[in-house]
C-alpha cells in the first residue's frame, strides 16, 4: 500500500507548497497498480477495505490535503464504491449529460448537478475513485453507469487529464489542469 498526499492543485492547511498536477497521471501509468482517489471518508474506508483484501495488486492512495465534504449515499452506493466507479448522483432516468469526477471534484460536480437540475437539466454524476478497478467490472455494470455510445460526458479532475480520454470519447470534454 502506497499513500500519496497533495493529490491536486487544491490548497490545503499547509499552504501552496506543491500542487501535484502530474501525480495521478503518472501513477495510473504504472502497470498493475490500482490508484484510488477517494472523495470522502466513506470512499476512503472502502478503498482501505479493498487494499486490505487485495493480495494480487499493489494499491496507491492519492489523498487530498483539503477537508472534503461528505457526500450522502445510499447503502447500494456505498457497496458500489468497491467497483471503482458508481452513480453518486442522479435519479436513474436518462441523463442529459454525465459528469465523471474523483476526489475533491466529486462534491463540486454534485453541487453543479444540483444547480443544473433546478434549471431542468438532468445530470448523472459518476464518482470514479479507481479507474483500474472500474475497468475490470462487467460491461453490463459499466453500461449502467456510463451507457455505451453516450456522447455528452464531462470528466473533472484537478490534474493532468490524459487518463480520461477513454471515458469521455471523441465528443466528450475534460476539465483538468495541464499546467500551473
PLM region descriptions:
Residues 5-54, 90:
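Conserved thiamine diphosphate
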Residues 1-3, 101:
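A short, small-residue-rich loop immediately preceding and capping a beta-strand
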Residues 1, 28-30, 167-169:
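Alpha-helix C-terminal capping segments
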Residues 10-20, 53-180:
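Thiamine diphosphate
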Residues 3-5, 39, 123-128:
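Beta-strand segments within the central parallel beta-sheet cores of soluble alpha/beta enzyme folds
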Amino acid at each position: 500500500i502506497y499513500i500519496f498526499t497533495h493529490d491536486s492543485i487544491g490548497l490545503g492547511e499547509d499552504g501552496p507548497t506543491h500542487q501535484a498536477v502530474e501525480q495521478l497521471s503518472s501513477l495510473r501509468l504504472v502497470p498493475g497498480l490500482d490508484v484510488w482517489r477517494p472523495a470522502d471518508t466513506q470512499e476512503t474506508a472502502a478503498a482501505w477495505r479493498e487494499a486490505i483484501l487485495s493480495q494480487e495488486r499493489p494499491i496507491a492512495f492519492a489523498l487530498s490535503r483539503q477537508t472534503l465534504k461528505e457526500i450522502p449515499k445510499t447503502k447500494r452506493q456505498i457497496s458500489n464504491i468497491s467497483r471503482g466507479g458508481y452513480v453518486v448522483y442522479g435519479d436513474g432516468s436518462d441523463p442529459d449529460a454525465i459528469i465523471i469526477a474523483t476526489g475533491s471534484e466529486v462534491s463540486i460536480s454534485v453541487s453543479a448537478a444540483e444547480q443544473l437540475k433546478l434549471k431542468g437539466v438532468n445530470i448523472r454524476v459518476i464518482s470514479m475513485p479507481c479507474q483500474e478497478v472500474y475497468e475490470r467490472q462487467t460491461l453490463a455494470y459499466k453500461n449502467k453507469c456510463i451507457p455505451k455510445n453516450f456522447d455528452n460526458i464531462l470528466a473533472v479532475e484537478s490534474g493532468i487529464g490524459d487518463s480520461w480520454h477513454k471515458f469521455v470519447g471523441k465528443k466528450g470534454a475534460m476539465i483538468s489542469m495541464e499546467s500551473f
